[in-house]
Amino acid sequence: MALKQLRIGTRASQLALWQANWVKSELEQRYPGMEVSLVKIKTIGDKILDVPLAQVGGKGLFVKEIEEAMLRGDIDIAVHSMKDVPTEFPEGLGLHCITEREDPRDAVISRGTKFADLPQGAKIGTSALRRQAQLLKVRPDMEMVIIRGNVETRINKLETEKLDAVILAAAGLKRLGFTEKVAEYLPTDLSIPAIGQGALGIECRLDNEEVKQTIDFFNHPATAYAVRAERALLWRCEGGCQVPIAAFGEVTGSDLKLVGFIASVDGKTSVRGTITGPAADCEKLGIKLAEQLLADGGHAILAEVYQREVSREKEIPV
């Protein structure tokens, strides 16, 4: 028997609310009569908008307060962008479902100019170090400008910050109806996506069987295998979502292909690798590829990145 009511915890950004409302709509269609409500929660990542996330430091910048609400019993489930979800959870909580992935690529928003045709010294707005590293590897002449804010705010910074282009996740642009602004979708071999990019995760209390059964139908096995492999790689590298680590898994039949990438922020030093194997062994594959990358130079790269960020964090009052 389905639950009579369900409370969904979500951030209050435009994209987060779209995602939570999509989950709400799917639940209401599947369980007519169920009362589904949204509980908006402000996270530390929403409060600190004038500092790059990498400098704020820590993990779970967009989920911690939501998880605290769940532990208090204020919400039943939480809907997250998978790329924001840390690889470790508070005791008693966990990721129960990973939804089918939307377009995982990065998108270029410009004045109609494709990435390769952007002028020498072009100013590029981005919120992610892994994008910055990969794009500088290809175009070291470019100037990367860290931008924050919701999707629409970042799009508008093309004009307000006098940028030549802004790079955003295609999934958010498609969900919010901004695809007409896209000049080009970057292939995943040029800009490997963030871990989990394009997928949603639904978190709940692990001991609540009724809630788990209610949301089971959201899980998309192929996406879940791919994202679990990506997250295992990130976990083994001890990385948060604000370090220049990228990974992208693709499932074909019962096989999984995983590409991983670690780089210095300026893109001058990087290591990349690929592994294939049974999708059912997704987490083992992610860990194995991570160990290969770390051994091939990734460990030294990350040690330098973390040292730099630790020194910056000390300067920031939170």
Curated annotation (Swiss-Prot):
Gene3D superfamilies membership: Periplasmic binding protein-like II, Porphobilinogen deaminase, C-terminal domain
Gene assigned in the entry: hemC
Modified residue annotations for S-(dipyrrolylmethanemethyl)cysteine: C241
Name used for this protein in its record: Porphobilinogen deaminase
Cited function: Tetrapolymerization of the monopyrrole PBG into the hydroxymethylbilane pre-uroporphyrinogen in several discrete steps.
Disulfide bonds: none
Cofactor descriptive note: Binds 1 dipyrromethane group covalently.
GO molecular function, one term: hydroxymethylbilane synthase activity
